[in-house]
């Protein structure tokens, strides 16, 4: 997108009565912004990649637990699309990181522990590449600017919305841990070889339901998600204006296609 087009979109949405709910993710070289139907990846080198989100059948969107798992899976779509954000080897790495913990559920205790630590360290190394933490803060700031109708001010640098977000995946992760522990401890059925896998999937689904529920009340969300908000002080850094603009370009691209004039 040309800068003039970006600014037109920002000014348009500053005047909007209602705005769509967007999500996103940060990478070492840019920011991905995700809408219901479209996503965009703006890179720090000025390039832009656009794509569409997978279509979820309407009946499944209203089905408790299934809708959460589908929403979670859909959030990874920009990474795994053939012409998406990640390249071939990176897609394989991410698939391994996602699937390995499920496989470790069947492993002996010490194997699962070692595998879990190795997986966590590998994922942290991937997340901490380049300026990911700064771009993570920029992603949050761009979305907050949309919700506060301060997009143009944020582009100009005269406004600095929060770099912390209630909808950040960090909050989801910190909520998932206690849910998974409690689920494993109080699993009511006789233990079998597949019990750990079932508990893991149900924990993900239940956490998504809880995560969605608490966000309906901003005050409740701030209390329940306080550990995640605290952890964001480690997973985000104060972005430069140029990095915030990268996120705003991705955001403008999604808005232009989600709700065209």
Provide a role label for each language-model segment.
Residues 30, 168, 231:
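Residue-level signature of catalytic and energy-coupling elements of molecular machines
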Residues 1-80:
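Divalent-cation
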Residues 176-205, 260-261:
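Hydrophobic alpha-helical transmembrane segments and immediately flanking/interface helices
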Residues 85-104, 161-185, 190:
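Transmembrane alpha-helical segments and their cytosolic interface motifs
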Residues 36-38, 105-136, 200-216:
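Hydrophobic alpha-helical membrane-embedded segments
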Residues 40-56, 123-155, 211-232:
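Juxtamembrane helix-loop transition segments at the membrane interface in multi-pass membrane proteins
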Residues 217-261:
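Cytosolic/matrix-facing juxtamembrane and C-terminal tails of multi-pass cellular membrane proteins
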Residues 62, 66-81, 139, 143, ...:
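Membrane-interacting alpha-helical segments
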């Amino acid at each position: 997108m040309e800068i003039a087009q970006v600014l037109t979109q920002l000014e348009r949405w500053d005047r909007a009565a209602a705005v769509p709910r967007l999500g996103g993710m940060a990478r070492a070289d840019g920011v991905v912004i995700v809408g219901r139907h479209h996503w965009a990846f703006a890179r720090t080198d000025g390039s832009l990649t656009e794509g569409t989100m997978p279509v979820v059948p309407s009946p499944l969107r209203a089905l408790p637990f299934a809708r959460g798992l589908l929403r979670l899976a859909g959030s990874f779509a920009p990474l795994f699309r053939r012409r998406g954000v990640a390249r071939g080897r990176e897609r394989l790495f991410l698939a391994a990181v996602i699937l390995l913990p499920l496989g470790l559920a069947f492993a002996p205790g010490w194997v699962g522990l070692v595998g879990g630590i190795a997986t966590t360290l590998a994922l942290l190394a991937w997340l901490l590449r380049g300026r990911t933490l700064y771009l993570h803060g920029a992603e949050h700031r761009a979305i907050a600017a949309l919700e506060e109708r301060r997009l143009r001010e944020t582009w100009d640098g005269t406004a600095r919305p929060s770099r912390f977000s209630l909808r950040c995946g960090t909050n989801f992760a910190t909520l998932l841990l206690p849910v998974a522990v409690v689920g494993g401890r109080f699993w009511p059925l006789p233990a079998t070889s597949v019990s750990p896998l079932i508990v893991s999937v149900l924990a993900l689904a239940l956490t998504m339901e809880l995560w969605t529920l608490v966000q309906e009340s901003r005050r409740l969300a701030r209390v329940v998600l306080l550990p995640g908000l605290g952890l964001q002080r480690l997973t985000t850094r104060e972005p430069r204006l140029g990095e915030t603009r990268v996120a705003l370009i991705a955001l403008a691209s999604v808005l232009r296609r989600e709700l065209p004039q």
